[in-house]
């Protein structure tokens, strides 16, 4: 369970309201320039990973609040930041750390309102280590004033950083996308799943008429000359990589939505005005999508803030309450924008429910991907459901287990682990599990996974952490049986189970084959001349049939299994691709 916000001390409140400098565009005038910590040219390997091994200096830390102040020089692509973190720990300690990209120049570091001399902190590799002459009692405030040119992604959002783009009219268009590398690409944070602040407050200063859209609720704006400061505040825990900056000459669509639970909350879309008719059409898709998720999973988790969508120069990302959208208003054969639906799914699977270790990232992406066929079924029926599932089935790699049960960074998941299988294979595992459990038990399990309870209502839940074992325990409870065998084969093994079907003179024999001969008593539907029989498959199973009978195993595609036809198709695609290159 994610920890609830802890009340701030009077000292912390004073620092937040009084200690921020009037300008964060230059080093404080009392700081000798010789003491300014210079940046490195490139981000370090430490910065470019998120999650994984936890630094000894961070193991006992949590973040109660993050106060983030940003301003920009758009011509020079410089970000100026002033961050105050309220940190907590179970016991006093003299040394602790947060993470920040070494590309930034450190101008000031303050601990509990006192500026630290240069020899009391270092940021050699992207871990900003702070040392005190005495034990620090917690909660404590750490303020970092910094500036520099942040990492610019080559291919966002797959490559992370701050994008400095231009609109068609030549206006600045800035967006952040840092899921793969982490929050430390543009603000000091604890770059781990557990590093989520219980509360985040943002002050974003931009030249008029630019608009700054971010997480949470817009408290107010303040004009000073040619600049405008947007003051935003979250009301719940937010993923660190989900804290996002979006700046452009946005227009705004807003409406109030009443959910199936009876509560009302705002829907907002920040968009560029060039394609207003298409923006309106996209915005009109939101109410039906929300109703789908609330019917199938449970209440929208952040109704006390907003449902937010923002147009970005990259494809998209699940930034909490300000989902990034850059799919160019494309439609697919499902009749909806799949990208917006997928990213919005992460409000439930990723933001309300967060994996406690990136090794369990399939809980975000597998469920997020399964929501597209499920939504197609909700809108159009079973045929549309299987069209989506079949499209997803074609690309499975099955090279690594989906879950390794080790501590992993997100990079490890993609470079050393299951990579794209956390999406489509994860979705197919979920589809198969639904068939085994039946809809009632399955959807109760999913709801409990997301909310920690089966009866969520607005106001009776908070964001939670979970992992694969948590889900297995929930599934076993609601199925009233032990389905460990299912997860042993589908999640903890790489290879798919294979069905052998052997025809002989007077019958047909079915058997499951798995790596390491793992038990796999998966029930199997068999169609004989159009009549369906279900086999329990506790062991080898034989049926009497003649050589003229038509026998189809799993005619309704309920079971994810090895099928040679998909391997042949992948081989043909690869061969055809190589031929075109020549």
Residue ranges and their predicted role:
Residues 55-58, 136, 146-200, 255-256, ...:
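Glycine/proline-rich low-complexity spacer/linker segments in large multi-domain proteins
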Residues 419-508:
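Amphipathic alpha-helical substructures
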Residues 34, 96, 101-165, 542-547:
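A surface-exposed beta-strand-loop module
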Residues 178, 287, 324-387, 446:
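Zinc-dependent metallopeptidase catalytic helix centered on the HExxH motif
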Residues 106-111, 483-484, 504-556:
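Beta-strand-rich binding/interaction modules
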Residues 81, 178-179, 190-341, 370:
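Hydrophobic helix-coil surface modules that form long, contiguous segments used
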Residues 18-80, 165-172, 194, 484:
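N-terminal, polar/Ser/Thr-rich
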Residues 235, 365-432, 436-437, 453-456, ...:
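Acidic/His/Gly-enriched intrinsically disordered linker/tail segments
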């Amino acid at each position: 369970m994610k920890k609830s916000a802890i009340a701030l001390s009077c000292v912390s409140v004073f620092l937040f309201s009084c200690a921020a400098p009037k300008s964060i565009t230059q080093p404080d005038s009392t700081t000798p320039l010789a003491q300014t910590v210079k940046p490195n040219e490139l981000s370090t390997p430490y910065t470019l990973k998120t999650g994984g091994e936890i630094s000894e200096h961070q193991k006992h830390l949590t973040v109660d609040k993050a106060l983030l102040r940003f301003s920009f020089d758009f011509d020079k692509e410089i970000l100026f930041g002033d961050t105050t973190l309220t940190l907590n720990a179970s016991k006093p300690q003299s040394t602790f750390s947060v993470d920040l990209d070494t590309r930034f120049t450190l101008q000031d570091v303050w601990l509990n309102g006192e500026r630290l001399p240069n020899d009391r902190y270092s940021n050699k590799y992207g871990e900003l280590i702070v040392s005190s002459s005495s034990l620090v009692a917690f909660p404590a405030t750490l303020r970092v004033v910094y500036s520099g040119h942040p990492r610019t992604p080559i291919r966002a959002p797959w490559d992370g950083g701050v994008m400095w783009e231009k609109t068609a009219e030549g206006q600045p268009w800035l967006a952040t996308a840092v899921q793969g590398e982490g929050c430390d690409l543009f603000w000091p944070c604890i770059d781990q799943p557990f590093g989520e602040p219980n509360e985040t407050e943002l002050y974003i200063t931009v030249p008029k008429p630019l608009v700054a859209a971010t997480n949470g609720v817009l408290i107010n704006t303040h004009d000073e000359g040619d600049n405008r400061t947007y003051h935003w505040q979250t009301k719940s825990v937010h993923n660190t990589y989900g804290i996002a900056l979006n700046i452009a000459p946005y227009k705004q669509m807003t409406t109030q939505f009443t959910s199936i639970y009876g509560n009302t909350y705002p829907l907002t879309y920040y968009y560029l005005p060039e394609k207003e008719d298409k923006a309106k059409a996209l915005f009109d898709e939101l109410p039906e999508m929300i109703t789908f998720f609330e019917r199938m999973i449970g209440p929208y988790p952040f109704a006390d803030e907003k449902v937010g969508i923002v147009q970005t120069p990259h494809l998209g990302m699940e930034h909490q309450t300000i989902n990034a959208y850059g799919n160019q208003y494309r439609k697919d054969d499902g009749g909806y924008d799949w990208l917006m639906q997928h990213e919005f799914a992460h409000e439930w699977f990723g933001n309300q429910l967060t994996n406690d270790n990136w090794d369990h990232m399939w809980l975000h992406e597998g469920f997020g991907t399964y929501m597209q066929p499920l939504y197609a079924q909700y809108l159009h029926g079973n045929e549309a459901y299987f069209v989506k599932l079949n499209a997803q089935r074609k690309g499975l790699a099955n090279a690594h287990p989906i879950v390794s049960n080790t501590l992993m960074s997100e990079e490890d998941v993609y470079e050393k682990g299951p990579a794209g299988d956390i999406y489509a294979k994860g979705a197919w595992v979920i589809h198969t599990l639904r068939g085994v459990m039946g809809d009632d038990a399955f959807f109760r399990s999913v709801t409990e996974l997301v909310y920690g309870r089966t009866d969520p209502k607005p106001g009776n839940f908070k964001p939670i952490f979970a992992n694969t074992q948590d889900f297995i325990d929930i599934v076993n409870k609601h199925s009233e049986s032990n389905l460990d065998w299912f997860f042993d084969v589908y999640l903890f093994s790489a290879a798919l189970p294979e069905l052998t079907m052997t025809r002989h003179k007077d019958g047909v024999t079915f058997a499951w084959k798995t790596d390491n001969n793992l038990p796999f008593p998966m029930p199997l539907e068999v169609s004989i001349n159009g009549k369906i029989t279900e086999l329990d498959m506790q062991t080898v199973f034989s049926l009497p049939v003649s050589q003229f009978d038509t026998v189809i195993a799993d005619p309704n595609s309920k079971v994810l299994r090895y099928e040679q036809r998909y391997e042949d198709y992948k081989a043909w695609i690869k061969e055809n691709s190589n031929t075109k290159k020549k």
